[in-house]
A protein has these predicted regions:
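Fe(II)/2-oxoglutarate oxygenase catalytic core
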Residues: 1-194, 198-203
């Protein structure tokens, strides 16, 4: 059973088998990686103050050694959480984003405070390169999730933190209210953190 992380995020601990996590990591490494961008369009911008991390876009239908796809392994768990707790009307699933955070002596890789949700529906410009454009157009991102593919002994830092839905102070871009940090079991390999896309969070 999933357990609440405070009141805005839910975790499922170790639901993806370690060997499947390692396979997904290898697929990510074999896929072209670029610096993650910010902004709501296909022509986003690189802003390393806000976001410095590697990003690759994964084929959700890529077959793994057990004959199932990445999509098959992850989305049933997320759907169950949504059906039991959040109850969003979900109409489509976006492309998987494989993100890496590497140690940099000058500036550690990170993704500072942000929310995934759009305040306006997706436009044709934003969807033009998406094969699922007809499903995505004029919709909103409602539910987000983060899958921890790495074993906790293999890295330091990388803490998932979030604040309440009131979000950030627009002057300081920092939370006015309490900040929460995911507990250790959310860092276990194969764990998933599920949260509404309007929740501000950082890594």
């Amino acid at each position: 059973m999933p357990s609440f992380l405070q009141e805005h995020c839910l975790q499922l601990s170790r639901v993806i088998p370690p060997n499947i996590c390692e396979e997904i990591i290898q697929i990510g490494k074999d896929t072209y990686t670029e610096y993650g961008q910010i902004g709501g369009s296909e022509e986003g911008i690189e802003d390393h103050y806000t976001r410095k991390s590697g990003v690759a876009w994964l084929d959700r239908d890529a077959k793994l050694s057990d004959g199932l796809t990445i999509f098959d392994h992850i989305t049933p768990h997320v759907r169950q959480v949504n059906e039991e707790f959040f109850k969003f009307d979900l109409s489509f699933h976006e492309t998987y984003q494989f993100t890496t955070y590497k140690y940099d002596p000058d500036r550690k890789e990170h993704y500072s405070w942000h929310c995934d949700g759009h305040h306006t529906p997706y436009t044709e410009e934003e969807c033009k390169n998406d094969p699922l454009i007809n499903e995505r157009l004029n919709t909103y991102r409602k539910l987000s999730y983060s899958v921890n593919l790495s074993h906790p002994d293999e890295y330091e830092g990388g803490h998932f933190e979030w604040t309440d839905p009131f979000g950030l102070n627009p002057q300081t871009m920092t939370p006015d209210n309490i900040t929460y940090r995911a507990e250790q079991k959310a860092r276990e390999q194969g764990s998933i953190i599920v949260f509404p896309s309007f929740v501000y969070h950082q890594v």
